């Protein structure tokens, strides 16, 4: 379905129901663009001619802050995020939770792209901002006939990976050293608050896609706070997100709005997607335990924002504790859902690109 600014009754929103089932709800409040191995080691440098030395550079720096290891997003930016084992475990737990809920590690027409991959004509996937590499390794296991590359500024990926999976360290703020039109699928997840210019990441991804390739985005755009089934956000939740948003902006980073994303993607092909709502701490059947795991994960995410809110926003530790506790209180007494935006763009076949 192509993008349109006009709300439509045909737009779909995907809900993960408290009983674990999936249901499509029709709504007029969502726009069309949000419809809803053998021993192997990780590679850190590729010596082939098409790669450049920028692979080992990165825009941010690692620091010790209180009892956490923080990666500052930019040298002149005070925002950052933890990269220690606690945060790595949180990210991987969120991946596994979403994989169980959605049934696959992806959301979108991935099989349409990968079904023609063969030994003589292997498809290629790029995972930008791969983090712990859990998504890339999962996809490599699931599609052994496809080559998967993960790239990030932080070296926290595993050493033992499937034979068709490789990881590289690179500066995401600069052009990646890949030829134009060299990937069939590019995946970007939870990167909108971890880079200085998310739209520029998207623009670069589109140039790296082959014609008929697929760009997959899975994010929480516009700092969308947890909501009730009726799209109501409790005051404690909203106060925390307002604080985080202000701190993010004060840190020298631009808050990426959904309309900015759509504007960047509009020329790349038809934009489709879903708004996925996941129950937090409530539900029946299999969702009883899964939603509780989601609640624990969300509490860990709240703590991961402490650095940005205190150092970037100028709040005190005590103020952060008050705000975060109000957030948690609302999570525990209200039936809320986390809002995830899943968007995908299929690049047209007849696209001409100029070499850089």
Each model region followed by its residue ranges:
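Conserved catalytic/acceptor-binding region of the Class I
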Residues: 193, 214-303
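A short acidic, Gly/Pro-enriched loop at the edge of an enzyme's catalytic core
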Residues: 176-185
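C-terminal lobe and adjacent flexible extensions of AdoMet/dcAdoMet transferase-like proteins
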Residues: 269-356
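Class I SAM-dependent methyltransferase Rossmann-like catalytic core
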Residues: 45-120
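Fungal intrinsically disordered, low-complexity serine/threonine- and proline-rich regulatory regions
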Residues: 1-49, 355
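A short beta-strand submotif of the Rossmann-like class I SAM-dependent methyltransferase core
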Residues: 188-191
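A short glycine-rich, Lys/Arg-flanked "PGG" loop and its adjoining helix->strand segment in the class I
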Residues: 199-214
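Class I SAM-dependent methyltransferase SAM/SAH-binding core
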Residues: 119-176, 200
């Amino acid at each position: 379905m192509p993008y349109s600014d006009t709300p439509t009754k045909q737009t779909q929103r995907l809900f993960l129901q408290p009983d674990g089932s999936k249901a499509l709800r029709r709504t007029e409040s969502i726009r069309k663009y949000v419809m809803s191995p053998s021993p192997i080691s990780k590679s850190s440098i590729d010596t082939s001619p098409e790669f450049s030395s920028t692979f080992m550079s990165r825009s941010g720096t690692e620091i010790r802050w209180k009892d956490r290891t923080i990666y500052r997003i930019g040298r002149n930016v005070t925002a950052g995020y933890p990269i220690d084992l606690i945060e790595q475990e949180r990210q991987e737990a969120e991946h596994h939770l979403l994989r169980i809920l959605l049934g696959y590690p992806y959301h979108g027409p991935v099989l349409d792209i990968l079904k023609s991959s063969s030994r003589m004509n292997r498809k290629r996937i790029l995972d930008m901002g791969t983090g712990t590499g859990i998504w890339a390794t999962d996809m490599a296991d699931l599609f052994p006939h496809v080559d998967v590359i993960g790239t990030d500024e932080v070296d926290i990926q595993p050493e033992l990976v499937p034979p068709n999976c490789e990881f590289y360290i690179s500066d995401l703020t600069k052009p990646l050293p890949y030829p134009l039109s060299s990937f069939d699928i590019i995946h970007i997840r939870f990167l909108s608050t971890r880079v200085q210019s998310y739209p520029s990441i998207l623009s670069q991804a589109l140039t790296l896609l082959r014609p008929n390739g697929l760009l997959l985005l899975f994010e929480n755009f516009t700092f969308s706070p947890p909501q009730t089934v009726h799209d109501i956000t409790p005051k404690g939740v909203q106060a925390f997100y307002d604080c985080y948003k202000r701190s993010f902006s004060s840190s020298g980073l631009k808050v990426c709005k959904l309309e900015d994303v759509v504007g960047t993607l509009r020329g790349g092909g038809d934009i489709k997607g879903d708004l996925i709502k996941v129950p937090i701490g409530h539900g029946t059947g299999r969702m009883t335990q899964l939603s509780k795991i989601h609640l624990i994960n969300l509490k860990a995410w709240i703590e991961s924002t402490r650095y940005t809110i205190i150092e970037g926003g100028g709040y005190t530790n005590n103020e952060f504790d008050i705000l975060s506790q109000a957030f948690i209180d609302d999570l525990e007494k209200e039936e809320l859902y986390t809002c995830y935006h899943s968007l995908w763009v299929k690049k047209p076949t007849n696209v001409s690109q100029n070499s850089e």
